C-alpha cells in the first residue's frame, strides 16, 4: 500500500511554532503587496491593506479616499496626504476629527502647520491635544460626528464587496476602494435629496 500523506509532513522544514509572525517571515502567495497587521491587542495579525477616508461633517460624504499598505503609521500619513490633496495651500482654517490612534505629537504638529485644527480624541495619558482645542464647542461637535466614518466602511464591506476583494496589488485594490466610496456617496444621495 502507498504511504498516506498527512498535513503534518507538508512543510516539515519550516516550523514557526512559538515564533512571532512578522512581514519578514510571512508573505501572501496570492498578493505580495498585502502586509500583516494587528488591528488591536488580543486579535490576530491578518494579511491586508488599509483603507482611509476623509468625510465632511455636514452630511457624511466621503470627499477623499486612499488605500495603502498596512503599517502602524499609514493612517496618519494618509490623513495628511488627503488633507493636502483636498485643500492644497489653503489658508482657511479647517478642522479634522479623528480617533485616539491619531493622537500623536508629530501628527498634531503637522496638522497645525497645515492650518488644520486637530479635533482628535484624547488619550488618557500623554495626549498631544491640549485645553486650547478641547474647550471649544466645535471640538465636542467633531467628536460626535467622527463616528460617521464607520458607516461608509461598513457599507463597503457588506454591500460594496470590500470585505474580501478579488483584486490583487495596491493600485488595483485602491481603485476598487475609491470606486466603492464613490458608490456609497451615490447610494446615500436619494435619501438626502428626499429630506
Kindly label every feature range from the protein language model:
Residues 57-59, 122, 157:
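Short, small-residue-rich loop/turn micro-motifs
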Residues 127-134:
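Short, charged, surface-exposed secondary-structure boundary motifs
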Residues 65-68, 108-113, 123, 167-171, ...:
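Composition- and surface-driven signal marking solvent-exposed, interaction-prone regions
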Residues 116-126:
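RNase H-like polynucleotidyl transferase catalytic core
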